Amino acid sequence: MVSILQLQTRTEASPASSASAAATRIFAVRRQQQEQEGEEEEEEFEFQERMDLSGAQGELPIPMHASAAASPFAGMGAHGGAGGGHVVELHRHEHVGNNGQAMAMASPPPTNVAVAAEQEGSPVAGKKRGGMAVVGGGGGVAVKYRECLKNHAAAIGGNATDGCGEFMPSGEEGSLEALKCSACGCHRNFHRKEADDLDADSCAAALRAAAGRHHHLLGPALPHHHHKNGGGLLVAGGDPYGAAYAAARALPPPPPPPPHGHHHHHQIIMPLNMIHTSESDEMDVSGGGGGVGRGGGSSSSSKKRFRTKFTAEQKARMLEFAERVGWRLQKLDDAMVHHFCQEIGVKRRVLKVWMHNNKHNLAKKPLPSSPPPPPQIPPMSMPPSPPPPQIPPMSMPPSPPPMPMPMPPSPPQLKLE
């Protein structure tokens, strides 16, 4: 009876052990393939770093092999057989279902591994590795390399380009020759990199197409989940560029700025004539006390000087004290100065500054002693001057009468017969 039970147990355990052994062999082969691919990627990346002489116009895109078998545990996810790296949920949700449905599968079906290997060898994967036309499958950024910017006259301090207008690879995509331009012979990094963002419609269409292509990699049907915050965004496709682009588009837009003139902070600005300034500049914020007020100053600047305001009584008392001590504080009068400052509520340093600022304006200047006025000399009386002698007018003799002029004799007249 015991032998029959042992035989039956071995018979029942044999299919499970054979399945686990097959899964182990599949994982071992897959790990070996991934190690070989990782070594090839490291060699290609090192070569690209050695060839990168310019360091300008962007960075070299590193080939990213993101497929269904990106992890040795491909197919073992929290969603029950979903291909690793193919479905990205961009929201938080709570799963409501049986624990058996949420558990991971014990081993992936061999068909998924075969399909993943076939997907890696497809032209789509080759396009991802090339990094020439499209970076990131399933919608992303189209990258083009335009004119060559290499300066061939840099050694002599000049600037000269070869005139190459567009990068043309020398070999097939994914090879080392593809990084060299067949037209000018320069590395691809010397050419200007141009990235064109695709619009939202084309990105959504590409995402849907990629989801349709990779639908057969998802395994069994996923259990239905209930979400508290509504439906999320599922990004299909095996590259991080498409996922990052979709994640950026799934984020909520920033709140619009408030309309102009509403919900803004009001700042009170006092006119200058409303601020009572005094003649003293206080260098310390804590200067003054009692009846000493503060000038209008901003609290944002800790180094701003505040002007101390004095009352009329304080000014009169300080003026009287300054005149009494001669507008100068001496060490011999420290006790008297301290007592006076306590009486009027002003610090000693503030009093000293006030006296220094107002010494030339408020100090009573003694008037210079004027000499006695000179004695007034009475004016001397002068005798009156005699009148000028009157000269009689001279009589002119009468003019003689004019003498008649004798007429000359007329010539004799001749008579004609």
UniProtKB/Swiss-Prot annotation:
It comes from Oryza sativa subsp. japonica. This is Zinc-finger homeodomain protein 4. GO terms for cellular component: nucleus. The record marks 355 as: Required for DNA-binding. It holds the Pfam family ZF-HD_dimer. The homeodomain differs form the typical one by having namely 4 instead of 3 extra amino acids inserted in the loop between helix 1 and helix 2. The gene is ZHD4. It comes from the Eukaryota. Homo- and heterodimer with other ZFHD proteins. One of its GO terms (biological process) is regulation of DNA-templated transcription. GO terms for molecular function: DNA-binding transcription factor activity; transcription cis-regulatory region binding; zinc ion binding. Keywords: DNA-binding, Homeobox, Metal-binding, Nucleus, Transcription, Transcription regulation, Zinc, Zinc-finger. Residues 13-22 have a biased composition (Low complexity). Residues 1-12 have a biased composition (Polar residues). PROSITE patterns: ZF_HD_DIMER (PS51523).
